[in-house]
Amino acid sequence: MSEHGSPESQWRAETIAVHGGYRPDPTTRAVAVPIYQTVAYAFDDTQHGADLFDLKVPGNIYTRITNPTTDVLEQRIAALEGGIGALALASGQAAITYAIQTIAEAGDNIVSASALYGGTYNLFAHTLPQFGIETRFADYRDPQAFGALIDERTKAVFVESIGNPRGNITDIEAVAKIAHAHGVPLIVDNTVATPYLQRSFDFGADIVVHSLTKYLGGHGNSLGGAIVDSGRFPWAEHKQRFRRLNEPDVSYHGVVYTDALGPAAYIGRARVVPLRNTGAAISPFNSFLILQGIETLALRLDRINANTLAVAKHLQGHPKVAWVNYAALPDHPEHALVQKYLRGHGSGVLTFGLPGGRAAGARFLDALQLFTRLVNLGDAKSLATHPASTTHRQLDAAELEKAGVSEDTVRLSVGIEHIDDLLADLEQALAKA
């Protein structure tokens, strides 16, 4: 993040998205961020190499850990979210995994909202338990439910700012107060909202994770993920709960992260332990492409928000549509939260159902000509999927209900095309459903 009081620290999101973390290269004067497609970096001398490995001086060792292109991406994302630092990774799933593994180990638990992206639910419900980390699921609509599940081995509370695919809006401020009352950080997946619509740290979140593959990259061409650290959670005040940050790390010559890195202890350990040791490093080329996408984030989101609201209103009045779920609609039960957290916008994901259930949904999807049938979201192109058959296919009926995914749910990720063309495609597909 930029120094407090510097011009960059006063920039709005639109400006940060274009300029954050980079000035023209001092050697070549290149205005575009260079792609440093290298594996390793030369040391000045033996002592310089030793100091780098001891974390005594900043610098690059190996692209698995740091890379100059990726460093610009990390600075830009941290500035957009208002954090102290960021760690870019190979995917959003890697970001979520490392966000937990940085502070949790066998015998620990996390408390998570049950309304989650299907991949995250599977990670929490089935994979983390294989490493001895339990996930306790709470109803996102009841902040007190999170507190009831926290104990002395709880390492984090996890929610999505806007749920995928449900489009539900989390009352982050209320959940943060519950988490902090128990001495536990709040991790928010801000993928669907993006920092353009919501800076989760402003409402009490401590850690933010992103799938950069989605709206920040914005063009469906690069996998990436990120963890952003607010630098505000008092890890050193909770030494017993967060021992890995407050006790010597034998794998790094006994460094104590809270002593060596202060408020950046968490993001520092995320880089030099889970990333260094398990290696989900982002490609410098992907970092470059995602940086290109971020430059147009505000323009794309403005168009996407307008298009999605128009689509939601059109579907809401359609005789072949049973229900529409989009929180930016005035009659949505979470509309007040959209006003509080998202400046009145609902982002680009909406869900709706057809009276004919799964079969009608399949006919609708198969009839689409402009919307692309796939499971990504956040693209400049409009996308459609049937979650129960794809992203949430591994969930049983009870798990689908907890996640808020019904058999008839169709998810749209609306893009930047002309609204009349989008509505025409939906209309002809509905006629065949």
Across the structure, where does each feature detected by a protein language model lie?
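Well-ordered beta-strand positions enriched in small/hydrophobic/aromatic, beta-favoring residues
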Residues: 157, 225-227, 324, 350, ...
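Conserved N-terminal alpha-helix of the aminotransferase class I/II PLP-enzyme fold
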Residues: 40, 45-97, 119-127
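Short, acidic Gly/Pro/Ser/Thr-rich loop/turn segments
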Residues: 42-46, 234-235, 297, 331, ...
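N-terminal glycine-rich, Lys/His-bearing helix-loop that initiates the first secondary-structure elements
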Residues: 1-60
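Short hydrophobic/aromatic beta-strand micro-patches
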Residues: 228, 351-353, 413-415
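PLP-dependent enzyme catalytic core of the Aspartate aminotransferase-like
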Residues: 2-4, 84, 125, 134, ...
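Conserved PLP-enzyme active-site core in the AAT-like
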Residues: 2-8, 17-26, 85-317
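Conserved small-domain helix->loop->beta segment predominantly found in fold-type I
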Residues: 278-281, 285-287, 292, 296, ...
